[in-house]
Amino acid sequence: MIDHKVHLSEAFFGRRKGKRLRNSQLARIKMLLPTLKIDLNNSAPPDLTSLFPSKVREVRLEIGFGGGEHLLHEMEHFPQTGFIGVEPFINGMAKMLMSLEQHKQHQNHLRLYDDDATRLLDWLPNASLDGIDLLYPDPWPKKKHWKRRFINMKNLNRVARVLKIGKKFRFATDIDSYANWTLYYFTHHHSFEWEAENLKDWKTPYPLWPGTRYEEKALREGRTPTYLTFIKK
């Protein structure tokens, strides 16, 4: 049996594990994840492109990639970009690793982290990322749980430190209260500017957007997605 150790911090709330993993998934967690996982016990390289065996021109981060569908899609379309994917939910990580067995060409420009994203953000060098995606994060819809949302001023300070000037933080949700919450925090932070001029700018999916399983469910249930983009000043 694999002991999948995690370390909780002030920013993580929720399940680490759901359905029982199949033996094939457990094998990928044991054998493949260690080859791709970022070890925070080592110092971060000044140039993050050195994390990747393949030559990459830039590095982007996706926080909470779920089963990895969007991340895999991005790697298909941006082969000269190095990607860092964070997913503390072990079932999502296992699904991603299974997909990587079928897309081995992506392994050389992908690095993974299976714990709290704030730990990774604190480890990264200043102005080291060319983009950050946070797509359909847990909205914690009950008001008493809103403090558990990833978007807060402390985490925006983290994001502002590691994101390069002129680069984008993209946020998608189908929960209106979380969209409004996110707008409030970003527009009250001195390091970001909201990239929007009219309604279609936050109702139109991002370029090359593949959609997600969660988004399909939201649309079936009558919820309208919101796509927010913020530029680091």
UniProtKB/Swiss-Prot annotation:
InterPro entries: SAM-dependent_MTases_sf, tRNA_(Gua-N-7)_MeTrfase_Trmb, tRNA_methyltr_TrmB_bact. Pathway: tRNA modification; N(7)-methylguanine-tRNA biosynthesis. One of its GO terms (molecular function) is tRNA (guanine(46)-N7)-methyltransferase activity. Its EC number is 2.1.1.33. It is an enzyme of class 2 (transferase). S-adenosyl-L-methionine binds at residues 62, 87, 116, 138. Transmembrane segments: none annotated. GO terms for cellular component: tRNA methyltransferase complex. It catalyses: guanosine(46) in tRNA + S-adenosyl-L-methionine = N(7)-methylguanosine(46) in tRNA + S-adenosyl-L-homocysteine. The active site is at residue 138. Substrate binds at residues 142, 174, 212-215. SUPFAM superfamilies: S-adenosyl-L-methionine-dependent methyltransferases. Keywords: Methyltransferase, S-adenosyl-L-methionine, Transferase, tRNA processing. Belongs to the class I-like SAM-binding methyltransferase superfamily. TrmB family. Catalyzes the formation of N(7)-methylguanine at position 46 (m7G46) in tRNA. This is tRNA (guanine-N(7)-)-methyltransferase. The lineage of its organism: Bacteria, Pseudomonadati, Pseudomonadota, Alphaproteobacteria, Hyphomicrobiales.
